[in-house]
Curated annotation (Swiss-Prot):
One of its GO terms (molecular function) is fumarate hydratase activity. Gene3D superfamilies: Fumarase/aspartase (C-terminal domain), Fumarase/aspartase (Central domain), Fumarase/aspartase (N-terminal domain). GO terms for cellular component: cytoplasm. Its EC number is 4.2.1.2. It holds the Pfam family Lyase_1. The record marks 331 as: Important for catalytic activity. It catalyses: (S)-malate = fumarate + H2O. Belongs to the class-II fumarase/aspartase family. Fumarase subfamily. Homotetramer. Substrate binds at residues 98-100, 129-132, 139-141, 187, 319, 324-326. The gene is fumC. NCBIfam families: fumC_II, PRK12273.1. This is Fumarate hydratase class II. The keyword Lyase applies.
Length: 463
C-alpha cells in the first residue's frame, strides 16, 4: 500500500507519496508539466546543492540563520552532493522559464531532509522552512542562472577539457613519427602539391589547441555569478555584501575562480555569457566535424577510395554486404557535431528572448549547453579510443598516389614558367604518361634536369 503525506503551499494542500522528500511546489510541477522525459541534468542539481550550501554558510556568517538551521542545511546538501537523493529531483526541463520549480524542488528536498534529521519526520516547513531558510536572501531569478553558470564551469572542467586534451595528445602521439611520410595534398578535392602526413595532422592538432584556448576565453564571463540580484537585479531582501561573500564561498568550494557579477540586471535579463560559450561549443563541433570528415575521406576504400589511412575495424558494417566495415566512430562523432550545432541554434534563439528584467528560457538554455558538453566530451573520448589510437598510414598507397600526381609539376614553375609547366601537366594527363615523359616529349627539360627539380622531399618545405 502506498503511503502519502499532506504538504501545502499558497494554493492549498496536496498529497505526496511519502517515500519522496519534495514538497507541494515540486508535486504541482510534476502534475502540471507532463511534457517529455528530459529531466534537469544531474550536474545542474549538484550545482544548486552547492549554491544552497554556500548561501546557508554566508547567511550564518551574517547572523541571518540560526546555527542549528544552517548546520542542518549544510548536512542535507552534503548528502545530496553524495548522490543519496538522486530520485528526488524528477522535474523536466519544460517548466517555468525561470527554473523556479527546480529551485523550489531543491529548497523543499533540503528542508525535508533537515526536518527529518531534526524531528524524525520528513517534509513540512518546521523547523526548517524551504523559503524562509533554505532560500533566504535568494530568488529563483538569481539562483537558477547562478546554478547554470556553476554547472557549465564544472561540466567543462570535469569532462570537456580532459576529453579535448585526450584527443590532442592522441593526435600528437599518432602523428609524431609521420614527418617522413610525404603524400599528395588536396584542395577542392583535387590533387594539389605534396605535404607530409605529420603536417596534415598538425592542422588538426592546432584546431584542438585553439579549441582549448577558446574555452578558457569564453569561461571568463561564465565565472560571473548572478546571485544577489534576487528578483529583478536590485538585490531586494538580500543583505548588502551577500553577493560578494557568496561568490567567494562558491569559489572556495569548487576551486574555480567565481566572482559576483558586477551588474545583476544584465545577469538576470540576459544570458549572453552562455550564448557566447555555446558559440564556442559550436566552433569546437565545427572543428571536430572537419577533422572527422578528413579522416573519413583519407580512410575511404579499402580498395576504391583514397585509402591513405587504415582505420580500426570495430564491427561489421552491413547486413547485406559481407565483409564490409564502416568508419562508425567518425559517423558517431559527426552526428554529435550536428546535434551541438542544432543546440547552439536553440541557445541563440532562447538567449535573444530575454524580455525586460528576466530571460525566461533558462532551462532550455542550460539543458542544451550541458548536453553539448556531454556529447562532445563522450564523442571525443570514444573517437580517441576506437579510432585515432588505431589509425595507421598505408605508406605504399600514399607513395603510389603521390608519384602519379600531376601537381608535382608545380616545382617546375620557377624554372620554366607557369605556362610551360601547364603544358607538361596537360600533355601527361592527355596521353596517360608521366610528367617526366611529357617534359622530355615537349623538349622542355631533360630527364636529369627534371629529376633534379622535381623532388617531393623538397616540396614540403620552404626553399
Amino acid at each position: 500500500m502506498t503511503n502519502y503525506r499532506t504538504e501545502s503551499d499558497s494554493f492549498g494542500e496536496i498529497q505526496i507519496e511519502d517515500k519522496f522528500y519534495w514538497g507541494a511546489q515540486t508535486q504541482r510541477s510534476l502534475e502540471n508539466f507532463k511534457i517529455g522525459k528530459q529531466r534537469m541534468p544531474e550536474i545542474l542539481i549538484r550545482s544548486l546543492a552547492i549554491l544552497k550550501k554556500c548561501a546557508a554558510k554566508v547567511n550564518l556568517e551574517f547572523g541571518d540563520l540560526e546555527p542549528k538551521i544552517a548546520e542542518s542545511i549544510d548536512k542535507a546538501t552534503s548528502r545530496i552532493l553524495n548522490a543519496e537523493f538522486s530520485d528526488n529531483f524528477p522535474l523536466v526541463v519544460w517548466q517555468t522559464g525561470s527554473g523556479t520549480q527546480t529551485n523550489m524542488n531543491m529548497n523543499e528536498v533540503i528542508a525535508s531532509i533537515a526536518n527529518e534529521e531534526l524531528t524524525g519526520m520528513k517534509g513540512g516547513k518546521s523547523p526548517v522552512h524551504p523559503n524562509d531558510h533554505v532560500n533566504k536572501g535568494q530568488s529563483s531569478n538569481d539562483s537558477f542562472p547562478t546554478a547554470m553558470h556553476i554547472a557549465t564551469v564544472l561540466a567543462t572542467r570535469e569532462k570537456l577539457i580532459p576529453a579535448l586534451n585526450n584527443l590532442l595528445t592522441a593526435l600528437q602521439n599518432k602523428s609524431k613519427d609521420w614527418d617522413s611520410i610525404i603524400k599528395i595534398g588536396r584542395t577542392h578535392l583535387q590533387d594539389a602539391t605534396p605535404l607530409t602526413l605529420k603536417q596534415e595532422f598538425s592542422g588538426y592538432i592546432t584546431q584542438i589547441e585553439y579549441a582549448l584556448e577558446r574555452i578558457e576565453d569564453a569561461l571568463k564571463k561564465v565565472y560571473l555569478l548572478a546571485q544577489g540580484g534576487t528578483a529583478v537585479g536590485t538585490g531586494i531582501n538580500s543583505r548588502k555584501g551577500f553577493d560578494i561573500k557568496f561568490a567567494e564561498e562558491v569559489a572556495e568550494f569548487t576551486k574555480q575562480p567565481f566572482k559576483t557579477a558586477p551588474n545583476k540586471f544584465e545577469s538576470l535579463a540576459a544570458h549572453d555569457a552562455l550564448v557566447e560559450f555555446s558559440g564556442t561549443l559550436n566552433t569546437i563541433a565545427v572543428s571536430l566535424m572537419k577533422i572527422a570528415n578528413d579522416i573519413r575521406l583519407l580512410g575511404s576504400g579499402p580498395r576504391c577510395g583514397l585509402g591513405e589511412l587504415h582505420l580500426p575495424e570495430n564491427e561489421p558494417g552491413s547486413s547485406i554486404m559481407p565483409g564490409k566495415v564502416n568508419p562508425t566512430q567518425v559517423e558517431a562523432l559527426t552526428m554529435v557535431c550536428t546535434q551541438v550545432m542544432g543546440n547552439h541554434v536553440t541557445v541563440t534563439i532562447a538567449g535573444s528572448n530575454g524580455h525586460l528584467e528576466l530571460n525566461v528560457f533558462k532551462p532550455v538554455i542550460i539543458y542544451n549547453i550541458l548536453q553539448s558538453i556531454e556529447l562532445l566530451s563522450d564523442a571525443a573520448n570514444s573517437f580517441v579510443t576506437h579510432c585515432v589510437d588505431g589509425i595507421e598510414p598505408n605508406i605504399t598507397h600514399i607513395n603510389d598516389l603521390r608519384d602519379k600526381s600531376l601537381m608535382l609539376v608545380t616545382a617546375l614553375n620557377p624554372h620554366i614558367g607557369y605556362d610551360n609547366a601547364a603544358k607538361i601537366a596537360k600533355e601527361a594527363h592527355k596521353h596517360g604518361i608521366t610528367l617526366k615523359e611529357a617534359a622530355k616529349k615537349l623538349n622542355l627539360l631533360s630527364e636529369e634536369e627534371f629529376n633534379k627539380i622535381v623532388v617531393p622531399e623538397k616540396m614540403v618545405r620552404q626553399s
